[in-house]
Amino acid sequence: KELEAIRLIKLGVIDMTISAGSLTNFAEILTFSDMPFLLKDTLAMHKLINSDIGKRIEREMIKKIGLRPLGYFQRGERHLTSNRPIKHPDDLQELIIRVPNAPSYVVAWKALGAKPTPMAFSEVFSSLQQGTIEAQENPFAMIKNAGFSEVQKYLNLTGHLITWGYPLVGEKQFQSLPKDLKAIFLQAAREMQVYEHRLFLDNESKLQKQLKDEGMIFVEVDKIAFMENGQEAVYESLSPQMQEVYKSIKKITQ
């Protein structure tokens, strides 16, 4: 759906969309906006987005895709759900985990000992129900909205990916605006970002309570063990040029 929206923006049928991960298909540097075990917490995410590398990512969106980011919004940490508690990477052995169709997800979970299985999100609930897969990973909002509490007992707080997205407008559409309207548009985007962050934080606490009320058991995990095992594999999968960018991100976000 996201790729279709991008196509329609290029055709001039629609003007705006929201990114959710598909941008990584267009340029290698964009993979850093959706990479497991890269960032340790939300503060690190904010540091990356507002750094020179974050601005480079935004420039690449304009150059390679023809889409201009209008600020960013938090999507929450991705956590692993399962029907057995997962506290350490050792508990993952042979666990069949649904992942998005993104190489870094496959590389990371395979390195941790699991069996990552790329699958469309629309197929996840029924596959969990039927036992085709045993686990999946998503932010609280996606876990709640998809009803995964009906087919998964444990919510393991891996926080393995700090996710964000971008409200996007077609660059051609943006450049067609008069100068004064561009300024108003960008100011509105800044106000939207502040408002969204406030809504996000409020919603996260509500979602956790709702998921617990639905019977999910929250499990604290050894985050350091997950990070150490996962990030090395992701790093090794990158090109030499992107490995240098990775190192820079780690310095920025410490």
Model-identified regions with their sequence ranges:
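Short beta-strand-centered segments that line the small-molecule binding cleft or hinge
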Residues: 47
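N-terminal secretory/targeting leader peptides
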Residues: 1-44, 53-254
